[in-house]
Amino acid sequence: LRARKFKIGYVPQYGGYFHDLTLLENLKAVGEIIIKDQRKRQEKIASLISKFALDNVQEIKAKFLSGGQRRKLVICMALLGDPKILLCDEIFAALDVLTIHMLKEILVNLQNENPKICIIICEHQARELLSIVDRALILSNCKIIAEGSPNNLIKDEKAKSQYFGDFFKN
């Protein structure tokens, strides 16, 4: 409830949904807590289902959805309250390349459509993350070792030695 008060949406690395409920039931369950007006709630849910191309799976139980569909469901759940801050924990974890590409497009589109939303992503897949962010921090042992634009981070000697290694060499 505190997150709702401060307009924060959270996308966990794993889970974050009710396995035995359908995609639609998951959205309705969370929507009832976040959006009191039934008409607005139904409109928001319908809009998110359409926007995330989940129309054809809305009656399927969450446990039977693909990894990408589940991740989209959890993003939709996080967006129900129109957050000002969206926290994403390891959003690309355990997903195939095509699904990662799809999620990157979703995040970029979300930022473009809502320029005031701040999307914070904790992610180990540097190449994937740096291709879509404006700014990044690299942490090591709970300390910031480098920060800046993706281009600057790739060139940063401390970031190279402690995190990237030869990862970005041609």
Where do the PLM segments sit?
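Catalytic Walker B motif of ABC-type/P-loop ATPase nucleotide-binding domains
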Residues: 86-89
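Q-loop/switch helix immediately C-terminal to the Walker
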Residues: 14, 21-32
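Hydrophobic anchor residue at the start of the ABC signature
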Residues: 75
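Conserved ABC ATPase "signature" region
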Residues: 39-57, 108
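Conserved ABC ATPase signature
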Residues: 61-65
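ABC ATPase NBD coupling module
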Residues: 1-9, 14, 153-157
